[in-house]
Amino acid sequence: MIKPRTPPGIMELLPREQIAFQRMLDVIRRNYERFGFLPVETPVFELSDVLLTKSGGETERQVYFVQSTGALANAAAAADEGAENGGLPELALRFDLTVPLARYVAEHEHDLSFPFRRYQMQRVYRGERAQRGRFREFYQCDIDVIGKDALSIRYDAEVLAVIHAVFAELGIGDFKVQLNNRKLLRGFFESLGVAEGELQLAVLREVDKIDKRGADYVRDTLVGEGFGIPAEQVARILAFVAVRSNGHADALAQLQALEGSVGASATLGEGIAELREVLELVKALGVPESAYCLNFSIARGLDYYTGTVYETTLTDHPQIGSICSGGRYDSLASHYTKSKLPGVGISIGLTRLFWQLREAGLIQGIAESSVQAMVALMDETRLDDALDIARRLRIGGINTEVQMEPKKIGKQFQYAARAGIRFVVLAGDDELARGVVAVKDLVREQQFDVARDELASTLQVELEQARAMLVAGSVQGD
């Protein structure tokens, strides 16, 4: 027999954990839709030449290629005949949702209304080295607003408001959206004489490692042979990226101080103006000032970000790292269309986030089953009645399971308890004679009688009370 096992780098959940994961997906989807984002799905695999247009190097080494058995046989036959294999396989699994979005918008450009607001929540695949907390298959939950030729900076503020709404409803603890602008960093580097484009990008990538590797590591790297930046300039860079704001007024004050202390730079001025407008609009959108701050070290390692950048962290669990990130880019689909399509967006890596929360013991207060009631079967003669009770419960909005085979009532209770089902409905001859059913509440360990016509509404009230207590407990815990 073959040993049943999953490939490395896969998160496979038992039902009660899958319920918790699914509810997080539901919360994210609900908030994306509340802000007017439209759902999009793209194929799990794309044409290789389309998918890999913007990539190379490390990304290409992590791509999973797809080959049919027929294509494999043809390639093998060609190899036997000494022919070249024709390059990469025709298809490849997507490694993120951004490149498929670029292809999607370019392909359907004339059928879409701009600004195009899309959300996408699907699995992506990367050939990561198998290790704890790293996944080869994982969910990403993205939103993007795409403009045609131009896109107002106001959308950058709205995206931050979406981040706040999502994590406030998820209820996984206090969080902070850290905000910066790549133009701010580029303008500051220009004032130091670090103006060459490739060098700037390389420095930005190193600055983005400060929270993970520490300032000493970044200092040693920048003064080392690879960069050779004078120690005095590196010290100024590290002092600049150490800036953090504390509250809305302090954030504006930090920008004001920067505006008056650094040499003139058009790029720096643009970055300051954009950040100031985002901050003012975030306040107007009702995001509490405790939920965001300036962090001048946030750069985002990806080179296509050109303006606003975001990283979100849990205040009490910084070891988890970024739980949501993104930013502004000038042109989404330049490899696929001549149209200029600027945009702003963010991504939540939900699989990694869920795994980290579970490891930290933060996945709590979740029902053990999506089944809310089970109708017990007392004996074979009661099957039609049990099925009718279940039908009425389902019509009343109660997720209901029926025991299809009569067993000892103790075993039926035991099954319901193990399955995480709260209510067991009993309808024997005695209950039928009195026009009621008996309900066993396995959470409160109580049993009560209910009129048949009132069963669904009674259970709805009980479930609503339980949900209210859960919300109250979450608020008190905060």
Swiss-Prot record:
UniProt catalytic activity: tRNA(His) + L-histidine + ATP = L-histidyl-tRNA(His) + AMP + diphosphate + H(+)
Stored PROSITE patterns: AA_TRNA_LIGASE_II (PS50862)
Highest taxon listed in the record's lineage: Bacteria
BP-aspect Gene Ontology terms: histidyl-tRNA aminoacylation
GO cellular component terms, semicolon-separated: cytoplasm
Entry keywords, A to Z: Aminoacyl-tRNA synthetase, ATP-binding, Cytoplasm, Ligase, Nucleotide-binding, Protein biosynthesis
Localization per Swiss-Prot or TrEMBL: Cytoplasm
One Pfam assignment: HGTP_anticodon
GO MF: ATP binding; histidine-tRNA ligase activity
InterPro entries: aa-tRNA-synth_II, aa-tRNA-synth_II/BPL/LPL, Anticodon-bd, Anticodon-bd_dom_sf, His-tRNA-ligase, HisRS-like_core, HisRS/HisZ, HisRS_anticodon
Known EC number: 6.1.1.21
Oligomeric form and interacting partners: Homodimer.
Family (UniProt): Belongs to the class-II aminoacyl-tRNA synthetase family.
Full protein name: Histidine--tRNA ligase
Gene coding for it: hisS
